[in-house]
């Protein structure tokens, strides 16, 4: 080593002024013993699980002085019968509509199931345990009434709360107080995917939410409870297709999130396909294309008779070129018997309105289709398919293709294909497509009272939210708190009601979509989620007070 470097260290005489970075003085912690606690709850006696069901769990133990890391286990029954069936990914979180922790009828903390799910997107273990597996999410088929479509299993839902942030520091101190955790469940229709053949009514009649609640309880000797702060999410839904929404009673808010949800109406949410466990954009498109190909190209001795009268099928000529208006499609199927012909469906799914002369035709989105016909199975094995089908095409519900706005008979598939359509009622879908790929917001403006708090014409708040949360959740978020937890009170924007600063108003400009595309006509709903700041004290039981002004 260079002598100059050595002398600069040895000869330095200000050691007393410096802090040791090679060791620390170890502190003796408070004496405590953690343990796992499991509780059976009381479930409301509702004979029909297609309505909201409520389970309550009471926690009171003279030896447990603090708790954290709440876990809800949900038993999913064995599923038997005829038809196609699967559970939505992360089914445990989708089971939950609302959860609250209360003491003597005062709510300490509450959250929706969707907010719980969003908070755990960076926790792969929590997501997997909540019901993300091939066994649960793959669409399985039963052929006879005694066929087992799904085995019974249990999913474990981590209910992430502010009391888990810093383990013992942030744990909920009970102070010899009874705690009640209440879980409201979603209808069964929100957690399953099925076709029209599956006996949904019988399944709902027999379905019962069987649950247990677990948590980590701490036995603490001489606990010294200190005041603390927690953030509680609060959400507001805007009016359908309106570009503005307002959150009132804003006093101390640590963040604001904005996103769009699709609204399909009261009609059955039927879609043409669903990939099941694998959820990439490619998986969605591949499954959709496979469904269409069964009707798009057929081999028959005469023109197929199993399509509706409005279906237009043409015989593929020897050249293999099928022309639909200004589009040429190349179709070649090998090994076709001499007494049979290849037919192409030229209007499998079409959409048009009186205001627009352009017809949206999915048959025109295919450019090349090649394959080999198997006479023994009467099926075509496709070897190459070139197309421009995208995720928005996949995300169009059947009801839009068949709606009154469409001047055409939009759905010209065979009855066999229509019977394979799936009912999907996922309440956690964001954006207007299944993967939230289409950024439906082109401009965002947030006002605090009458003053513009933030404005953007590019999705900077969305990019930063993905970066800071380490996951993609499709939300634009303004964070007002970057303060380290436990030792510091979270920073917030503070209300000033005398100047009208007690509400957050959000206005968005929706991205321009092609009015010829059916996705244009899906209703949109603006959703705002803010996190209000509360102070937790233990003067006489557990008290949670909303922060009204700067303290």
From Swiss-Prot:
GO terms for cellular component: membrane. It holds the Pfam family Pox_Rif. InterPro entries: Poxvirus_Rif-R (IPR005008). Keywords: Membrane. It comes from the Viruses. Scaffold protein which forms a transitory spherical honeycomb lattice providing curvature and rigidity to the convex membrane of crescent and immature virions (IV). This association occurs concomitantly with viral membrane formation. Targeted by the drug rifampicin, which prevents the formation of this lattice, and hence virus morphogenesis. In the presence of rifampicin, irregularly shaped membranes that lack the honeycomb layer accumulate around areas of electron-dense viroplasm. Homotrimer. Self-assembles to form a layer. Interacts with A17 (via N-terminus); this interaction is necessary for D13 association with membranes. Belongs to the poxviridae protein D13 family. Displays structure similarities to capsid proteins. This is Scaffold protein D13 ortholog. It comes from Swinepox virus (strain Kasza).
């Amino acid at each position: 080593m260079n002598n100059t470097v050595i002398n600069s260290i040895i000869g330095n005489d200000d050691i007393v002024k410096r802090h040791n970075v090679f060791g620390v003085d170890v502190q003796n912690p408070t004496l405590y013993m953690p343990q796992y606690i499991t509780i059976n709850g009381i479930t409301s006696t509702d004979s029909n699980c297609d309505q909201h069901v409520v389970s309550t769990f009471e926690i009171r133990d003279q030896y447990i002085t603090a708790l954290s890391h709440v876990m809800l286990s949900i038993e999913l029954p064995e599923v038997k019968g005829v038809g196609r069936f699967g559970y939505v990914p992360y089914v445990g979180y989708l089971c939950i509509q609302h959860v609250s922790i209360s003491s003597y009828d005062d709510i300490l903390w509450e959250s929706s199931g969707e907010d719980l799910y969003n908070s755990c997107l960076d926790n792969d273990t929590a997501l997997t345990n909540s019901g993300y597996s091939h066994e649960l999410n793959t669409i399985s088929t039963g052929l006879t009434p005694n066929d087992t479509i799904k085995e019974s299993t249990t999913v474990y839902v981590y209910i992430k709360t502010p009391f888990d942030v810093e383990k013992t520091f942030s744990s909920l101190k009970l102070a010899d107080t009874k705690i009640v955790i209440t879980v409201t469940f979603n209808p069964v229709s929100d957690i399953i995917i099925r076709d029209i053949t599956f006996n949904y009514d019988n399944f709902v009649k027999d379905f019962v939410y069987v649950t247990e609640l677990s948590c980590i309880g701490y036995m603490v000797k001489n606990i010294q409870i200190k005041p603390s702060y927690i953030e509680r999410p609060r959400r507001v839904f805007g009016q359908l297709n309106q570009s503005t929404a307002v959150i009132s009673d804003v006093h101390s808010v640590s963040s604001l999130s904005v996103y769009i949800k699709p609204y399909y109406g009261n009609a059955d949410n039927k879609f043409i396909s669903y990939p099941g466990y694998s959820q990439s954009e490619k998986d969605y498109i591949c499954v959709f294309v496979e469904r269409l190909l069964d009707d798009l190209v057929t081999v028959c001795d005469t023109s197929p008779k199993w399509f509706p009268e409005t279906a237009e099928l043409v015989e593929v000529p020897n050249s293999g070129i099928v022309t639909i208006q200004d589009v040429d499609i190349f179709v070649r199927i090998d090994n076709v018997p001499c007494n049979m012909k290849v037919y192409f469906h030229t209007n499998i799914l079409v959409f048009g309105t009186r205001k627009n002369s352009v017809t949206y035709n999915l048959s025109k989105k295919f450019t090349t289709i090649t394959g080999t016909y198997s006479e023994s199975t009467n099926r075509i094995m496709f070897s190459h398919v070139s197309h421009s089908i995208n995720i928005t095409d996949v995300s169009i519900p059947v009801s839009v293709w068949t709606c009154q706005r469409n001047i055409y008979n939009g759905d010209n598939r065979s009855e066999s294909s229509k019977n394979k359509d799936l009912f999907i009622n996922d309440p956690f879908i964001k954006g207007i497509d299944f993967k939230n790929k289409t950024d439906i917001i082109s401009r965002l403006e947030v006002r605090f009272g009458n003053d513009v708090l933030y404005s953007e014409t590019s999705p900077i708040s969305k990019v930063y939210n993905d970066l800071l949360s380490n996951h993609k959740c499709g939300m634009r978020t303004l964070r007002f708190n970057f303060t380290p937890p436990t030792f510091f009170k979270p920073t917030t924007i503070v209300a000033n009601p005398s100047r009208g600063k007690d509400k957050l108003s959000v206005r968005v400009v929706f991205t321009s979509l092609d009015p010829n595309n059916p996705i244009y006509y899906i209703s949109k709903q603006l959703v705002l989620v803010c996190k209000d700041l509360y102070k937790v004290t233990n003067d006489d039981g557990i008290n949670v007070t909303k922060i009204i002004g700067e303290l």
